[in-house]
Amino acid sequence: MEPDKDAWGTSRHSRLFPGPWLVHADLHNHTTLSDGKGDPADAFASMRAAGLDVAAITDHSRWASVAAGLVAMPGNSGIDRYGWEAAGRIADAADEPGAFVAMRGFEWSSALYGHANVWRSARFTDPLRSGLVAMAPFWRWLERHGEDGLAGFNHAGSAMLRFGRFRHRPAVAERVVSFEIFNKTNEHLLLGTERGRPSALVQCLDAGWRVGLLGVTDEHGSDWGHPEGKGRAGLYVHELSRAGVYEALAARRFFASRVKGLRLDAALDGVRMGGTVPVRGGPARFAVDLDRAGWTGRRLGVQVLRSGPGLPTLAAAVEVRVPGPDEPPVAFEADLGGAGGWVVLRVTDPEAAADPPATGQWAGLGRALAYASPFWLVPDGR
């Protein structure tokens, strides 16, 4: 099924690229299988009723393996073998290809290094078995026992050691697909910079990780999918199935949002977000497809972010107006100031207050609404 409009009345079709179409997803949720408050049997129905097309249960894995599967462990210890199997049964029962995708995953939850989601894997692990005092054991698990999994960095702005300062691991880099830029109601672009730490996004991308940008609710309550203002994601899929979702994640063909029913797509010199762009010199041309029911004519800001010392460099900031269906998509040019590296587009509401700890020019840009996945710049080989 490929419906023309989503639950909020927004067209699912990008005006920039044919083919894949938009589905709304929340890929990070908790239940009583770990430290959530809601029955896992109710989670997928709640998210489907809330208008989501794709949902995942990703309960914490912590230290339940200490029991070696001999007895069931309490939820605050994270999932054990019994919880992992139960999550799989619940997801399989809720999954309806073509109508709604239900997925099982887990959140590897280290108090020191941070939290990472893993989807698609047949197995799970926890920090007690893979990473109590280092990141390397988790990466090795993902290489060997979790070789079928896709992974992502969760709420990295608040992580203590930030995955070992995001030290790059080439063997798993293609399967580490995401970075949560919105988690719950928090934006993780500047979180931690008020304490002198670098932007987690800059730190991650500069380390060489080619991740797309996700929004997630990280829901721990029992109203999955319903609260306003929490993160969510838009994926462009070829089919509404688990395979279609995994393909879109692997292609980094997705965006982060904290607004329900938003469509965002972006191109840099004709290359879609998440792609590699040859740099030919001169101004770069951006095209942005923005739409939401009732937003025609609304004033928004679009910022072009590049690497910088600690904080992102603001390469450009433009004011745009959401076009109507008979008007061309937003387009503008910007000087990227050098070849190589990465580019991220950020969409803001200039009339709403920026999230703490934004100060200076960042405070003046307003509240972040969405992010496109990064573009990766490479020298033109012609």
What are these regions (language model features)?
Residues 1-382:
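Extended, charged catalytic domains and RNA/DNA-binding interfaces, predominantly
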